[in-house]
Regions:
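Elongated alpha-helical scaffolds
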Residues: 79-93
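Extended, low-charge hydrophobic alpha-helical regions
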Residues: 7-10, 57-59, 159, 355-357, ...
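Short, ordered loop/turn segments at secondary-structure junctions
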Residues: 38-40, 50, 89, 103-104, ...
């Protein structure tokens, strides 16, 4: 093994500035959108930090660590994916400057970790205020802070209400999972305001026979993951037929087998059958004559969700059907929306599965709405169990910055300069918010810093006009969990990268 492409420690932080500059314009209500052409030829229009980074094809290890950073924040918290990358990039940029000034990397690392502890303590002790978790208005304000900056800002309140309702239906935070307890079904037709949550499931399927019933009240439902057709031999078989009537007998034997299978099903009097596999035309005909509707070739995941809606098991063999395998629903209907047919199965109140229906005129908007809904659900899930709120609009970041400056005065060594440099780096969030509003950055940051130094820690940036406002008065709040996790991940990532002095790329000898 030989090593090539050795990079110096002070050089490999440059890529973090590139990533930071890419995401800066996506922060806040005045954020810009990115148009991404992915490797499958699809066009994605979004300002979601994690979505943008996820689609980048980058081989640089530092850039990959920042992308992983954003992904971690998205999985654990669901919000703050842009913030965490901007802070981490600023800390790496600062590390580069300090290393060039001959500061020891271990001294910088220790200062970073101390500053992190100080910041987390300050958020919990001085900035966090209690709030009524059962007050829907306060919860919606918190979710709006996250969702209001997205592409679908016009419909942000509706998405907030959907997110909160989805989480409140299942109060157990750890048990709530999208795609496990909830499904998001996207329907590309006009009428965003028609988006809603239903107690059941929606599948993009129609009945398999045009004359079968498309509307049934209190249906008895059977779920299968097997075929309803003549069972073919697993081994290859050849038949020689010398007489014409023998061919008719073979066809009749197949038909009798399918009629026998249909009669086995008929004994349990189901109104509706869902199966993951195929149903032959002969079986469809006999089931239709028996007044049984059939929907075939559904996804395995949808079949499992149906099982939760109707409270029954999925049957693998028709010969093993039992009475307990027949489930019940409140209502079944097939509706034509746009050019497609959608199957609605509405469960009873005890149903363990819900579907969030999203309507929008285009698939691009639907995809962005889904991303925003995931963020909203994540924030709502944390908010319901949160112990407090902190001011948004960069107020928290500026307050932490001022606190670190005050703490730096107790040091008389190198930590004095490093603490002040870290404090300056944390101003990246309010500074970026002001930049994106197109107003004088220096003037506004000095004004904000002045307000903060006068103990007005609630003052931050109003993201649409760039004005200095009292965040508590206008209800601009964030969750301390989001900010604390963003700081932890950003500082710890920067600390790990500080301990790397070389990047070595290995290649095998020929």
């Amino acid at each position: 093994m030989v090593f090539s492409n050795v990079l110096n420690q002070s050089n490999y932080y440059d890529v973090s500035e590139l990533i930071s500059s890419l995401l800066k314009t996506t922060l806040g209500p005045r954020s810009m959108l990115k148009m991404i052409l992915d490797n499958q030829g699809r066009v994605i229009i979004t300002n979601d930090g994690n979505c943008i980074l996820r689609e980048l094809d980058i081989k640089n290890p530092i850039a990959k660590s920042l992308i992983e950073l954003s992904n971690t924040q998205d999985i654990e918290i669901g919000d703050g994916t842009t913030t965490v990358v901007l802070i981490a990039a600023e800390l790496l940029k600062l590390a580069k400057v300090l290393l060039q000034k001959r500061y020891n990397s271990i001294v910088i690392l220790n200062s970073y970790l101390n500053a992190l502890e100080e910041s987390i303590f300050f958020i919990k002790d001085s900035l966090s205020i209690p709030f009524a978790r059962d007050n829907s208005k306060d919860l919606i304000k918190v979710i709006l802070t996250s969702i209001g900056t997205k592409l679908v800002g016009r419909f942000s309140r509706m998405i907030c209400e959907l997110s909160l309702k989805a989480v409140k239906i299942n109060q157990k935070k750890d048990f709530f999972k999208v795609n496990t307890n909830f499904k998001i079904e996207k329907i590309p037709v006009f009428g965003v305001e028609k988006s809603k949550i239903i107690a059941g499931i929606v599948i993009s399927k129609d009945v398999s026979h045009p004359k079968m019933r498309r509307k049934i009240s209190n249906p008895k439902i059977l779920l299968l993951d097997c075929n309803i057709e003549f069972k073919k031999s697993e081994m290859r078989s050849n038949f020689e037929i010398s007489e014409g009537h023998r061919w008719k007998e073979l066809i009749k034997a197949e038909e009798d087998q399918e009629i026998y299978i249909c009669n086995l099903i008929k004994k349990f009097n189901p109104d509706l059958i869902f199966t993951e596999k195929n149903v032959s035309d002969i079986a469809l005909h006999y089931l239709y004559k028996s007044n049984i509707s059939v929907i075939r070739r559904i996804r395995k995941s949808d079949n499992e969700r149906l099982s939760k809606v109707i409270g029954s098991n999925i049957v693998s063999s028709i010969e093993r059907i039992e009475e307990d395998d027949i489930g019940r629903a409140k209502n079944f209907s097939v509706r034509k929306i746009g050019d497609e047919y959608f199957t609605y199965v509405i469960g009873f109140d005890f149903s363990k599965f819900k579907t969030i229906l999203l309507f929008a005129p285009s698939k691009d908007i639907l995809d962005e709405m889904e991303r925003n809904l995931h963020d909203g659900i994540s924030v709502a899930r944390i908010a319901i169990s949160s112990q407090g709120l902190i001011p948004g609009g960069g107020a928290t970041d500026m307050a932490i910055s001022n606190n670190l400056i005050n703490k730096s005065r107790i040091f008389k060594n190198n930590n004095f300069y490093i603490y002040r440099a870290i404090a300056s780096s944390l101003e990246i969030i309010p500074r970026t918010l002001v930049e994106n509003c197109g107003v004088n950055v220096i003037k506004k940051i000095v004004e904000l810093k002045g307000n903060q130094e006068n103990k007005f820690c609630n003052y931050g940036i109003e993201g649409r006009g760039g004005n200095i406002i009292d965040c508590r008065k206008i209800g601009l709040f964030e969750l301390p969990e989001v900010k604390i996790n963003a700081y932890k991940v950003a500082f710890e990532n920067a600390s790990i990268l500080l301990k790397i002095d070389k990047i070595l790329k290995g290649k095998a000898l020929n």
